[in-house]
């Protein structure tokens, strides 16, 4: 639910993890 894509830990979100 965030406007800007933030680097998330692997596993949590693979889609946003690439950012």
UniProtKB/Swiss-Prot annotation:
Belongs to the alpha-ketoglutarate dehydrogenase family. It is found in: Mitochondrion membrane. Signal peptide: none annotated. It comes from Solanum tuberosum (Potato). This is 2-oxoglutarate dehydrogenase, mitochondrial. Its cofactor is thiamine diphosphate; Mg(2+). One of its GO terms (cellular component) is mitochondrial membrane. Its main location: mitochondrion. Homodimer. Component of the 2-oxoglutarate dehydrogenase complex. One of its GO terms (molecular function) is oxoglutarate dehydrogenase (succinyl-transferring) activity.
